[in-house]
Amino acid sequence: MTSQGSAYSRFQRSLTTGNLQLIEAAAAELPKVSLEDALAILIVLAQRGDPRFERAAARWVGRLLTETPAGLSDARFALALVERLPACRDALHGLARRR
């Protein structure tokens, strides 16, 4: 297994724990956190009621707009969904998968 595969496996396992310290440490080992992986982290922040959630949510929507062909209506939709996390995760995953 490559070191990146190993790092990504650790990251995936950390997400299942919901432990933000483990998640942050594992994410720091990755060369880049994908938009979908960033959403997974955002969902954990929402579940935990973490005070960093709002800023992280704004950054995530910004990434959505720059990394996908999303437009203004998608941005409004994404903001509405992000405010309802973790309930609307599937719809947000769908937006993140657009290429």
Residue ranges and their predicted role:
Residues M1-R99:
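Long, low-complexity, acidic Ser/Pro- and Gly-enriched intrinsically disordered regions
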